[in-house]
Each structure stands twice: as structure tokens, then as C-alpha cells.
Amino acid sequence: MAPDPWFSTYDSTCQIAQEIAEKIQERNQCERRGEKTPKLTLTIRTLLKNLKVKIDLLKDLLLRAVSTRQITQLEGDRRQNLLDDLVTRERLLLASFKNEGAEPDLIRSSLMSEEAKRGTPNPWLCEEPEETRGLGFDEIRQQQQKIIQEQDAGLDALSSIISRQKQMGQEIGNELDEQNEIIDDLANLVENTDEKLRTEARRVTLVDRKSTSCGMIMVILLLLVAIVVVAVWPTN
């Protein structure tokens, strides 16, 4: 399996930084002895330029790996920490290079850190999680893609649930609208029925009055007939 290009570049960059630190130390020792160092100075300048190019390449590779989800966010953060250390070391080496005739503690600390990292090309692997321990780069990428697919499936399921809940809410709203329409129809029916009852009540009252008037007229007519009969009835 082909090695990870990012770590291959990282290892070579660390070697360049180590070489620069050693060359600066050698130059400073020569200058303390009164020796001229134009060749060493030129070599250090060239190595510093190469170091900057390598660091820029590491930045591009890391950005591409994170943006295309070839690595997890945790792995990206770890690589970014390593890259930040390299950038800091580059600045320290450049400052030490410009400080001619001096050998600051920065050079010695850089040498010690590089010695400590020898034999451990990928120092962050000691903190590698159990899920990816022993897996190759392609296997880790497949595992990450599987995790992303599972997350996408979970988001799709959540979206489906939200859609169903929204649809249920719309159906409940429609049912409430229908019930409100039924209640409005019942209210109109009750109002119309009440109006009809009032109309019929007025009619009954009118009929009752008419009935009372007709009864009185009949009584009066009967009385008149009785009077006439009594008047014309012969008496002895």
C-alpha cells in the first residue's frame, strides 16, 4: 500500500528543518573560530527556501484532504497541529539564521526535538483511536465514507420524520377548518330555525286573536236572533 503523501512530505520537511538547524549550528561554530562561511550561508538560504515550499505543499495537501473528506476532522486537527509546529520552527530557524554569530537556545531545542522524533515518522499515531488502529489509508477513508453515509442516512430519516409531522399538522389544521365550517353551518341553522319559530309564534298569536274575534261575533249574532225571535213571538 502506498504511503500517505502528506506524511511522506511531512517527514522530508522535518529532515530539511533538521538539516537547517545543524547547518546554522555549524556556521555559528565556524564564525566563532574566525572562519568565513559564505558556502554554508548559501546552503542555509537554499534549504530555507525548500522548507517554505514544503510547508506550503503540506498546507495545500491538508486543505484538499479536509475539503474532500479524505480524513476525519480529528485527524485534520492533528495534522494542522504538526503543521503549526513546522511553521513555528521555520520562523525560529529563520530568526536564528539572521542572527549571525550567535547560537540561541532555539537551535538546540530544535535539534533536541528532531532527535526525539527520529524513529517516529508519524508522531501523532501514538494517539490513534482504536477505530482506525492498524488500518491503511484507503481503509480509513472507506471507514470515513461509511460514517458520512450513515450520517447522511440519519439526516434523511430525520428529514422524513419532520416532513411527516408537518403533513400531520396540515391534516389536523384541515380537519379543524372543516369542524369550524360545520359549527358555522349549525349556528346558521339554529339562527334560521329560531327565526322560523318566532315567525310561527306571531302567526299563532294572530290566528288566536282572529279566533277570539270570530267567537264574539257569533255570540252577538245569536243574541240578535234571540231578540228578534222574542219580539215576533205571539203573546196571549
From Swiss-Prot:
GO terms for biological process: cellular response to type II interferon; early endosome to late endosome transport; regulation of protein localization to plasma membrane. The gene is Stx8. One of its GO terms (cellular component) is membrane. The chain crosses the membrane at residues 216-232. Residues 233-236 are vesicular. Vesicle trafficking protein that functions in the early secretory pathway, possibly by mediating retrograde transport from cis-Golgi membranes to the ER. Ubiquitinated by HECTD3. Signal peptide: none annotated. Keywords: Coiled coil, Membrane, Phosphoprotein, Transmembrane, Transmembrane helix, Transport, Ubl conjugation. It holds the Pfam family SNARE. The modification Phosphoserine is found at S160. Residues 1-215 are cytoplasmic. It is found in: Membrane. This is Syntaxin-8. One of its GO terms (molecular function) is ubiquitin protein ligase binding. Forms a SNARE complex with STX7, VTI1B and VAMP8 which functions in the homotypic fusion of late endosomes. Part of the SNARE core complex containing STX7, VAMP8 and VTI1B. Interacts with VAMP8. Interacts with HECTD3. Interacts with TPC1.
